[in-house]
Amino acid sequence: MSLSRPPRVLIATAGFGDGHNTAARGLAKALEGQAESLVTDPCEEAAPWLNNVLRNGYRFVTTYLPRTWKRIYNSVEHHDFSRQKIPFMRNVETAFAAQVKRFNPDVIVSTYPLYPYFVERYIKGGGRPCPMVTIVTDSIEINASWRKSPTDFWLVTDRETKSSLIEQKLPEQKIIETGFPVDPIFDKLSPVPTDDHAKPFRVLYFPTASKSSLIPTAHAILEHQPWPVELTIVLGRNFRRLYHLTRKLVDAYPNRVRIKGWSRRVPELLCEHHLVVGKAGGATVHESIAACCPMLIQHLVPGQEEGNLELLRRIGAGDLAETGPALAAALRDLLSDRASHWHRQKHRLSLHARPAASRVAAGFVLELAAKARSSPAPN
């Protein structure tokens, strides 16, 4: 192996939820100029049509059939991932092994729990060994697919998650608390100050695909509050589905509602707003924490997102508000007494925010790569 070339880091991700891709991109950006990194989605590359069907199915079930999803999620606790039984994943594993062989990485990083099992079988089949790092994109409540992963290290989002994994008998020396690897730009941005007067109070809203919840949620935010509130709605992939409804809000509340489509400025938007409302996905929750922006959870996916909500509650920076009345009441509570509760949440977030987490994770990966490159190759 030539030590004259930059270290090579293969970062494997998946599109089942935004957290995996957000973590992969954040780490890759932090590695720029220090390593040759390749971000790959093995599921997308091996079977793009089927992968798209499965992703859409995942979003549908988690949005409209949460109880069904919880049963699926809980069943994973008893699944043996060391044996490959799904034909679709066999094709993915074969394609991934070929990519590993071509790229010849010094370290493999996975932001999705299944890929370390692929790497283990690849090495057992004669592939070149290299360190395996798993970035756990959930918090506190960690699924068996992550915990049983045959990895050298788990990078986790916070102290509570590390403690949770240690309690479940994972080796402490293999659990590295780096924070969620958000975009490195967070470390350069200035959040809304803790002592901001919050007038008008700017709310950033990430709606789900559900048409039935958008208007009631917006009304709950915009009406019957102690002082002026402005709303920015980021539609993202739901732009076509929800745009006509959001236009009605723009007309109903002149100069108080803004619409964003697919935005690359999410870090900046989070740092410009006083509150975020959305689902409790790992990406949104940890980006909100990095931006010191309190959060109200309007949609909770049972299972993996329950730990993210618990983390917000332990920090003292957010809570669940799934109905219109609950959301309106939570917002009034934040804004009462000159927004004293909001100011307290901002202060709590300032003690827990990790806007440089991706650089911390990148430093760990680079150190691991250096050790691997300096070690003699196994016979």
What are these language model-derived features?
Residues V285, I289-A329:
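Catalytic binding pocket for nucleotide-activated donors in carbohydrate/polymer assembly enzymes
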Residues G26-F103:
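Conserved N-terminal ligand/cofactor-binding loop architecture of enzyme catalytic domains
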Residues V100, R128, A144-W154:
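A conserved, positively charged/aromatic
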Residues D152-A209, N238-R241:
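A nucleotide-sugar donor-handling region in carbohydrate enzymes
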Residues H197-H273:
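Donor-nucleotide binding loops and adjacent catalytic segments primarily
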Residues G324, R332-L351, K371-S375:
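Conserved donor-nucleotide binding/catalytic region of nucleotide-linked donor-dependent transferases
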Residues C271-G281:
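Acidic donor-binding loop of glycosyltransferase active sites
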Residues R354-N379:
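C-terminal alpha-helical cap of glycosyltransferases
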